[in-house]
Design a protein with these regions (language model features):
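Short, well-structured alpha-helical segments
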Residues: 30, 49, 53-56
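Short, low-complexity N-terminal intrinsically disordered segments enriched in polar/charged residues
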Residues: 1-27, 31-32
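Residues that flank catalytic or metal-binding motifs in active/ligand-binding sites
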Residues: 33-35, 102
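A short gly/proline-enriched turn/hairpin at secondary-structure junctions
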Residues: 36-47, 59-62
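A beta-strand edge to alpha-helix "cap/lid" segment located at domain peripheries
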Residues: 1-4, 16, 54-129
């Protein structure tokens, strides 16, 4: 199977999701996920939109603020690829902000192509000090 990617501006659903994380609100921006979506970030294996939302919130609540930056976005229809950088600023002022690279694959739902069915991503390395 051959897949053709087109470089595009990031879609609003992606920007809205990152904004929810950056603002620590975890609200409607997560509606881009199918109700039974799966998320594999690093070693995570979260099943369901609400589990994705809750686990990301728990991770962010460990003591830092994130700010996501989109470097590039590629669209191949049912597969979307995003690359960027996230600024991770610790709540503890004695610790240094880090800027790990991110790469994410979003596999869209077969019956509703406005929803993410499977999110696979990597961020890092992430080390504070």
């Amino acid at each position: 199977m051959q897949v053709v990617f087109t470089k595009k501006a990031p879609p609003q659903w992606l920007l809205d999701m990152w904004k929810e994380i950056d603002d620590k609100t975890f609200g409607q921006g997560f509606d881009c996920f199918a109700e039974d979506a799966v998320c594999n970030l690093g070693v995570s294996d979260w099943k369901g939109r609400e589990a994705i939302r809750a686990n990301l919130k728990a991770f962010i609540d460990t003591g830092f603020t994130a700010m996501h930056h989109v470097t590039e976005y590629w669209d191949a229809g049912s597969l979307k690829v995003f690359r960027g950088v996230v600024d991770m600023t610790p709540d503890d002022p004695s610790m240094t902000t880090v800027h790990p690279t991110m790469t994410h694959f979003f596999y869209m739902d077969e019956t509703d192509d406005t929803k993410v069915r499977h999110w696979v991503g990597a961020v890092g390395p992430v080390t504070f000090g």
